[in-house]
Design a protein with these regions (language model features):
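Short, amphipathic alpha-helical interaction segments positioned at domain boundaries
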Residues: 72-97, 145-180
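Short amphipathic alpha-helical interaction segments
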Residues: 36-50, 114-130
Length: 315
């Protein structure tokens, strides 16, 4: 079975077809002639672009035509190819190039897992030659001049994430996503068979001795993470709604209940990846000092004590 990364990847042939479509609808015969593609090669690549939600087909008389789809990610890619037509996207958005860009738009340190150093530096040179990437502190980021590229990457990623979620349930709601990892809320009746989906956040609380129940389950989709630790459950609970004090209290209850077992180093490291570093430090301090710091969403100690009694947590 293909990974998500393999499904979103572009080939040079796909980019060449898309370049032809930026100025309008084309017939299949026109594309074959213009690109020197045989019928089977053209058909194969059109099928992949259809699956990516980027194009649509229609038939008039005996001729079949293709054009860009009206979906948000398709419109953004069309504009990107049109505005920056002079850039050789065939050598930038193919292979590991797109994979590297997806990691760059993630809000944490560029680790570039799954990419050899030689491959990374090869693509980095290409991106920087065109001014697409710039370095800020110890991270690479997409230049503001290419904000349309960043917008496309975000929407393209969300397209695939929503597709996975919708296959789970028509009632599935994506709560958070980053680099093809995401949290999704589904009805408890949904049966999960994929090893890439893990029960997490408040849905794990009952098994951890905290009687918090819901008619929905929170699942974490990841192609890298094999199991969910208590620290992960704490962070995923915060990600449900970052500024909601209710979820902060739930996370605090779990942190306090297992404070002797929590791997603080792992917790802080993972928190940085989710832009929750400051929040976690404040929560750990809150547990130790019983007082709030700054304007972060934290309860008063009295409020926390009341919730702790309600859920049977000794404070």
């Amino acid at each position: 079975m293909k990974t998500v990364q393999e499904k979103y990847a572009f080939s040079k042939s796909e980019i060449k077809i898309l370049r032809e479509l930026v100025r309008g609808e084309r017939s299949l015969s026109d594309l074959r002639k213009k690109l020197s593609f045989g019928p089977s090669l053209l058909s194969y690549n059109l099928k992949k672009l259809l699956d990516k939600g980027l194009i649509r087909e229609n038939t008039r008389g005996f001729r079949k035509y293709v054009q860009f789809n009206d979906s948000k990610h398709a419109s953004l890619l069309k504009n990107l190819l049109l505005v920056y037509y002079h850039i050789d996207w065939e050598n930038l958005l193919v292979g590991k190039g797109l994979y590297i860009l997806f990691q760059i738009i993630s809000d944490f340190e560029n680790s570039f897992y799954g990419v050899s150093k030689a491959t990374f530096w090869r693509y980095l040179r290409r991106f920087r030659t065109h001014g697409i990437l710039q370095k800020k502190v110890n991270k690479y980021e997409i230049s503001p001049r290419f904000s349309i590229l960043a917008d496309f990457l975000n929407e393209y990623q969300l397209f695939f994430i929503k597709r996975i979620a919708e296959k789970l349930s028509s009632e599935a709601v994506v709560l958070w996503h980053r680099d093809f990892e995401f949290l999704v809320r589904v009805p408890k009746t949904v049966k999960v068979t994929s090893e890439k989906l893990h029960l997490t956040a408040t849905s794990l609380f009952p098994s951890l001795g905290l009687p918090i129940f819901s008619e929905y389950n929170i699942l974490f989709h990841s192609e890298r993470k094999k199991n969910i630790k208590i620290e992960d459950a704490v962070l995923h609970t915060l990600l449900i709604e970052r500024k909601n004090v209710r979820y902060v209290i739930y996370s605090l209850l779990l942190l306090h209940k297992y404070k002797e077992k929590i791997d603080v180093g792992y917790l802080k490291s993972e928190a940085q990846k989710y832009n929750l570093g400051v929040q976690i430090v404040s929560m750990l301090s809150f547990i130790e000092t019983h007082s709030r710091q700054g304007d972060l969403p934290l309860p008063t100690w009295t409020e926390f004590e009341a919730k702790a009694r309600e859920y049977g947590v000794t404070v």
